[in-house]
């Protein structure tokens, strides 16, 4: 669909923008023997045809710029703070041994979930999400509570009932699930890589460490109200305004180029 719309716009000289959400080159390389540089070349050609390419973080912007992507614009993410809040509770996991360590997301090889499930932690591990690796992980880790996919209030209840959100991915461009956890008053433990570095950084709402188990233990000491406070800086209103500003800037940029 993206290529079809791109062709339509280029043929009719219509201004358009794109957005870069997923590390397709790395995801593809994790499954098939396709060189990362090949896939980036295809994506670079696609995105450089537009008047602007929106990216979620400073880290991703710098990386793509180094790979030859042009007209990059920052477009951060927002969280529904009315839905994801600390006062909720989930009957599904409330009686599990504490602390409850939570993962939410696609259950697939590129998410590096094994790094979380292999940790020796007290309490319980809960995985929310579906994906191609779900059945295999269920068999390999019978001690883990796999809930499958959850959305809306059921998901929000699970977040708020947990004690630590573990984000083991090394390839996500942002990780909005971290914002959802923080908005629910839950601290984050993650690796110090792009994505977590941009969302957590030095906010104190989580801990980044190459030793993920050590990050979890430290994150459990973070006050829940501080996590909520940090998440509230990422509103849907602010994200929407940033998107609209980018669209206007792209239009003005093309108009200025036409005058040269």
Language-model-detected regions and their locations in the chain:
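Donor nucleotide-sugar binding/catalytic pocket of nucleotide-sugar-dependent glycosyltransferases
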Residues: 40-89
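Short alpha-helical donor nucleotide-sugar binding micro-motif in glycosyltransferases
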Residues: 47, 149, 157-162, 243
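A charged, aromatic-enriched C-terminal amphipathic alpha-helix characteristic of glycosyltransferases
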Residues: 89-91, 221-255
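Conserved donor-binding/catalytic core segment of Leloir-type glycosyltransferases
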Residues: 92-126
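Nucleotide-activated donor-binding/catalytic signature segment of Leloir-type glycosyltransferases, i.e.
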Residues: 134-153
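Aromatic "clamp/platform" in nucleotide-sugar-dependent glycosyltransferases that forms part
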Residues: 170
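Short hydrophobic beta-strand element within catalytic cores of glycosyltransferases
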Residues: 178, 183, 187-190
């Amino acid at each position: 669909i993206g290529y079809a719309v791109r062709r339509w716009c280029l043929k009719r000289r219509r201004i358009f923008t794109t957005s870069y959400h997923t590390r397709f080159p790395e995801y593809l390389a994790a499954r098939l023997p396709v060189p990362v540089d090949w896939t980036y070349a295809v994506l670079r050609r696609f995105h450089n045809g537009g008047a602007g390419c929106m990216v979620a973080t400073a880290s991703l912007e710098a990386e793509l710029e180094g790979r030859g992507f042009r007209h990059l614009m920052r477009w951060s993410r927002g969280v529904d703070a009315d839905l994801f809040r600390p006062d909720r509770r989930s009957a599904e996991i409330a009686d599990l041994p504490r602390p409850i360590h939570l993962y939410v997301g696609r259950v697939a090889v590129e998410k590096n979930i094994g790094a979380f499930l292999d940790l020796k932690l007290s309490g319980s591990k809960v995985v929310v999400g579906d994906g191609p690796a779900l059945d295999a992980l269920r068999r390999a880790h019978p001690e883990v509570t796999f809930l499958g996919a959850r959305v809306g209030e059921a998901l929000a209840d699970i977040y708020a009932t947990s004690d630590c959100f573990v984000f083991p991915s090394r390839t996500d461009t942002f990780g909005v699930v971290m914002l959802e956890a923080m908005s629910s008053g839950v601290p984050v433990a993650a690796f110090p890589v792009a994505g977590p570095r941009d969302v957590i950084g030095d906010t104190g709402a989580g801990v980044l460490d190459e030793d993920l188990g050590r990050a979890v233990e430290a994150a459990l000491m973070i006050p829940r109200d501080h996590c909520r406070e940090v998440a509230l800086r990422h509103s849907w209103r602010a994200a929407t305004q940033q998107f609209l500003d980018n669209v206007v800037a792209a239009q003005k940029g093309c108009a200025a180029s036409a005058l040269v």
